[in-house]
Each structure stands twice: as structure tokens, then as C-alpha cells.
């Protein structure tokens, strides 16, 4: 490879492409848009779900279920991850989980699940515990403290209604 083989590729100050200025310009007459059709017209933009006039997928596939706006969002964490992230005798709180990037995003309640091994004595504060998680925590000598819900269902409904 020689120095004269190297090229800059995309030029920084490429001149604007002038279209529709006669056949000698190379982009005259149809201005690079082909002949007729929707895509040749000005102002046309196809809908993102347009499938060439065929029955679109979102109308072919049956709809199922609904989104329950009153449902709780529950964040689950396993005792195995807590065992890896925390030291012996530490207290596992929502703030501590967020500081160690174990609890992310917005959620209403925290649930501790029993997947993995727990060998350290931990005090774990959460809204819910699975049976296996409670058994593993007590077997390791730790305690499972249940937190009160952030908001009651009635309070959540009132908060969502007031957002409107």
C-alpha cells in the first residue's frame, strides 16, 4: 500500500446535490425518484406499519389481555445475589440494593426469592419473601423483616386519578 492509495472516504465539505436542473446535471427530470408512484410525490411518508397494502400484521394477529394500570410492580431479587453482594452481618435495605445496582428502576414492592445459596447472616428488609427465601435466611442465622407497603391500593388509585 502506498500513500497515494489512501483516500479520505467521506468528504467533510461535500457540496449540496442540486436536483431537477436539467438532463445534463445527471439528476434532472425525475430527480432520482424514479417514475410516478407514492414515493415520487412530495410530502409522502409511509406509515411505519404499512405493509404494501396487504392486511397488516397488527390486524391479522388477535389481541390478547390488557394492561392493568392498578397492578403492583414487584422487583424480585434472589438470595444468591444478596449473598454475593453483601458481607456478613450487613442489613439489606432498598437503599443498599440501589447503591450496589441490584435494584433498578421504579417499583412498588421488593420481593426476595430463594434461588441460590445463602451462607452469610444477613438482616433483609423487603415487602415480600418467598417461603424458600425465608427458610434459607433463617437457616443462615439471618432475619427477614417485612416492610409495610409504600402505598395501599386505594392510595395508588387516588394518585393515578389525580395525575389526569
UniProtKB/Swiss-Prot annotation:
Q: Which organism is it from?
A: Rhodopirellula baltica (strain DSM 10527 / NCIMB 13988 / SH1)
Q: What's the protein called, per UniProt? A: Large ribosomal subunit protein uL15
Q: Which InterPro entries match?
A: Ribosomal_uL15 (IPR030878), Ribosomal_uL15/eL18 (IPR021131), Ribosomal_uL15/eL18_sf (IPR036227), Ribosomal_uL15_bac-type (IPR005749), Ribosomal_uL15_CS (IPR001196)
Biological processes, Gene Ontology terms? translation
Question: One Pfam family this chain carries?
Answer: Ribosomal_L27A
* Assembly and binders: Part of the 50S ribosomal subunit.
Q: Does the keyword Ribonucleoprotein apply?
A: yes
Bias class Gly residues marks the residues at 21-31
> Highest taxon of the source?
Bacteria
Q: What does this protein do?
A: Binds to the 23S rRNA.
Q: Name one GO cellular component term.
A: cytosolic large ribosomal subunit
**Taxonomic lineage per UniProt?**
Bacteria, Pseudomonadati, Planctomycetota, Planctomycetia, Pirellulales
Task: Please give the SUPFAM superfamilies that the UniProt record associates with this protein.
Answer: Ribosomal proteins L15p and L18e (SSF52080)
Note the PANTHER family from the entry: 50S RIBOSOMAL PROTEIN L15 (PTHR12934), LARGE RIBOSOMAL SUBUNIT PROTEIN UL15M (PTHR12934:SF11)
Question: PROSITE patterns in the record, alphabetically?
Answer: RIBOSOMAL_L15
Location of region: Disordered? 1-57, 132-164
One GO MF annotation is: rRNA binding
List, as start-end ranges, the regions of compositional bias called Basic and acidic residues.
Answer: 147-164
Similarity annotation:
Belongs to the universal ribosomal protein uL15 family.
Give the keywords, sorted: Ribonucleoprotein, Ribosomal protein, RNA-binding, rRNA-binding
Comp. bias intervals (Basic residues): 9-20, 32-41
Amino acid at each position: 500500500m502506498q500513500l497515494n492509495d489512501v483516500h479520505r472516504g467521506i468528504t467533510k465539505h461535500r457540496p449540496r446535490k442540486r436536483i431537477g436542473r436539467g438532463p445534463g446535471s445527471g439528476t434532472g427530470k425525475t430527480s432520482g425518484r424514479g417514475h410516478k408512484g407514492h414515493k415520487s410525490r412530495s410530502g409522502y411518508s409511509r406509515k411505519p406499519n404499512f405493509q404494501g397494502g396487504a392486511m397488516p400484521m397488527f390486524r391479522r394477529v388477535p389481541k390478547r389481555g390488557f394492561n392493568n394500570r392498578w397492578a403492583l410492580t414487584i422487583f424480585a431479587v434472589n438470595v444468591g445475589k444478596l449473598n454475593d453482594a453483601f458481607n456478613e452481618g450487613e442489613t439489606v435495605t432498598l437503599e443498599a440494593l440501589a447503591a450496589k445496582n441490584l435494584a433498578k428502576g421504579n417499583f412498588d414492592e421488593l420481593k426476595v426469592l430463594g434461588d441460590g445459596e445463602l451462607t452469610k447472616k444477613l438482616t433483609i428488609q423487603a415487602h415480600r419473601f418467598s417461603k424458600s427465601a425465608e427458610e434459607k435466611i433463617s437457616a443462615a442465622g439471618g432475619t427477614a423483616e417485612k416492610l409495610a407497603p409504600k402505598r395501599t391500593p386505594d392510595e395508588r388509585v387516588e394518585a393515578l386519578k389525580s395525575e389526569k
